[in-house]
Amino acid sequence: MQPINSEYWSKLIDKFKIFSIYTIALFYISAGVTHFKNYDFFEAIVPPVLVFKSEIVYVSGVIEIVLGLLLCFKKTRHKAAWGIVLLLIIVFPANLYLYFSDVPQEALGISINQAFNRLPFQIPLLIIAYWHSIEKSSKKFSILCTFLFILTVIYFLSI
């Protein structure tokens, strides 16, 4: 039996990366729509020091939808992926607020452990967004990102 050649694995990883791009795009579009369908959830995690809570929830929802759509097109993928990186960094304080304050935990009916689980989840999302921003990456990095993508999908489906 012959071992599978390196070119085969490269093509397989490239196809999986495309699959991950469209899947993540769908997740961001879906999350953006959820800002409108489940407004109360997102409003509850906006830190109280921020004003214009409604606008923050709706604008961030629109941004997620737009970035998800732009991720689908090769011409706009690089900018969309970096937009996702920026968005993840900007909204991270909401996850911190959810963890450190019992107010949003009680409003959403989640435990401190569930709130804590959201914090490290941002790291794979950032790495995957970076992976999607570059056309070619090393085989090892692509394998890492493939693994992180699978864990991300499992996490998304479990919440």
Regions found by a protein language model. Give the residues of each.
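Membrane-interface extramembranous regions
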Residues: 2-159
